[in-house]
């Protein structure tokens, strides 16, 4: 689906939190869908509301450029972030991630700046920052056309109360429509994939029935257009995951959407972690099937309280069909 104009995605939270949804790629302006993410009895609800509220816009500065080239020199994509909140609102902290060909991409935003996986940018109300996303593609071979997509994480370092872990809108993901990179040279191609922990199963009847009861139209299969990506928690309906003996078992479930090639990256404290010394998990989604990933992560060297989430991004030419999804963040307790 072709990109039209520039992307302006406004994150707006009114009293209650909201969850950002996948954008419509043909929309010139995309707004988040509002969802109440707070429980009425949450004892620290006011604090969560305050730190997870705001209004941010971001996008490409060059509205007309859809395609970039990599010829061995750095790719540079002009970009902006703007805090559109009122003067009495708080400073916004945004974590900015970049994905190339489905892989997390290290980059910098200044010519001599620090290369990082996530750049964290603070914005006062009404403040706007313009910069460039500067990088050498971590994936792709000469002759390929690969997708590149920036994604923001709202208030990335926020951690909820352990007794009642409500995130509000903290650590929610929003993304631009993808751009294309024509590979005139090979990318660095240093990242390694694993398929070891992946299995494919039928989507459970319970889930299918829930969808049938919710979406009654016979005109289309709603699961074909809705990506569902989940990380199982240790306690049902509670966003918390407990480790034991410096290890933690994780289970990821991915279903719905188109049949595409995807890459899954797991993050602890906003940094990608390896699985069996590999950088990401390679999967192929299938209509009517669920991808299940089970693995154990080593928590040696981590503090007691952490955040954990996973992001899945299409690879190859499939970025034109479907782009990026994130699990809800979980509070990871390292024992």
Predicted region positions:
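Bacterial signal peptide processing site
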Residues: 19-21
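Intrinsically disordered, low-complexity Pro/Gly/Ser/Thr-rich segments with frequent PxxP/GP/PP motifs
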Residues: 110-140, 277-296
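Short glycine/proline/serine/threonine-rich loop/turn segments at secondary-structure transition edges
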Residues: 89, 138-149, 158-160, 300-309
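C-terminal motif of bacterial Sec signal peptides marking the signal peptidase cleavage site
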Residues: 14-17
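Short beta-strand elements
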Residues: 158-214, 316-335
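Short edge beta-strand/loop segments characteristic of extracellular beta-sandwich folds
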Residues: 76-84, 249-255
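Short acidic, flexible loop segments centered on an aromatic residue
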Residues: 86-106, 254-272
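Low-complexity, acidic Ser/Thr/Pro/Gly-rich terminal tails and inter-domain linkers that flank the onset
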Residues: 25-71, 199, 204-237
